[in-house]
């Protein structure tokens, strides 16, 4: 039997990152354990997207450490990081608009270098999760609805066989019913496949219900953390992110 694995899958320590002289991250500490869903919430401009992008090396960390699976990846080039089975669905989806759904999914699979049978297994899994995509395999990405594009962005990330999936605002701009489908899919991936997820959301209510733990970021710093349930109960969270906010 191997020793219990107490080391987080992703450990971020004292992370700083800047755009020119704008300091977007000012010493962030955040852990994601294997098998967890962790939500990162915070107002516009807090630095949430920057945190995710810094894991991929763009922008580069100016100080602090990013440790993934025990490996210091703080200064690793972006193309190396994609091969470490970390996948990202960035804010604004960024699918390939001129490519078909099938081609978009293939782009994700190319990162994984899986065998033919692994690819077809992964494709089945994505199309079972998002049957909508199955009906639209030959349609251009750019002509999909917002919800379908989000499904495609997540599907493409899944095709790279990630251990850690980072999602930046997957529910942004989606009707509540479609947003719920996306959150349900994330829950299924976590529960069935043990996928580890770091999710950035302004929809704090949904995100904290979905997540095992959450962090609140204000102005480049983590100001609060706890279980999803604990954070949902906190009056300052309710006031800032739930009551009267985007639900
Ligand atoms: N490419 C860039 N160049 C200069 N400043 C940037 C750039 N990207 C982000 N910033 C600044 O860094 C800060 C953090 O931005 P970031 O996009 O990480 O916030 P966020 O929490 O994801 O916000 P939102 O909820 O609006 O997506 C903001 O002040 C933003 O203006
Ligand atoms: Mg953002």
Please place each PLM-identified region on the residue numbering.
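Glycine-rich phosphate-binding loops of nucleotide-dependent enzymes
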Residues: 2-247
């Amino acid at each position: 039997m191997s020793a219990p694995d107490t080391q987080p899958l992703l450990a971020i320590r004292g992370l700083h990152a800047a755009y020119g002289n704008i300091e977007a991250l000012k010493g962030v500490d955040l852990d994601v354990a294997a098998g967890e869903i962790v939500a990162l919430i915070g107002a516009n401009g807090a630095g949430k997207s920057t945190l995710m992008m810094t894991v991929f090396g763009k922008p580069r960390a100016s100080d602090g450490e990013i440790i993934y699976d025990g490996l210091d990846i703080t200064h690793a080039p972006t193309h190396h990081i994609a091969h470490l089975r970390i996948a990202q669905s960035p804010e604004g989806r960024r699918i390939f608009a001129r490519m078909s759904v099938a081609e978009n999914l293939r782009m994700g699979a190319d990162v994984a270098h899986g065998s033919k049978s692994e690819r077809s297994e992964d494709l089945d899994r994505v199309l079972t999760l998002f049957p909508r995509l199955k009906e639209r395999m030959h349609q251009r990405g750019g002509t999909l609805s917002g919800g379908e594009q989000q499904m495609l962005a997540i599907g493409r990330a899944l095709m790279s066989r990630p251990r850690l999936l980072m999602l930046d605002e997957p529910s942004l701009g989606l009707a509540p019913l479609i947003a719920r489908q996306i959150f349900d899919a994330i829950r299924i991936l976590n529960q069935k496949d043990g996928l580890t997820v770091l999710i950035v959301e302004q929809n704090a209510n949904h995100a904290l219900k979905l997540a095992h733990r959450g962090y609140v970021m204000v102005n480049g710093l983590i100001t609060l953390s706890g279980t999803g349930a604990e954070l949902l109960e906190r009056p300052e969270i309710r006031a800032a992110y739930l009551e009267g906010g985007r639900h």
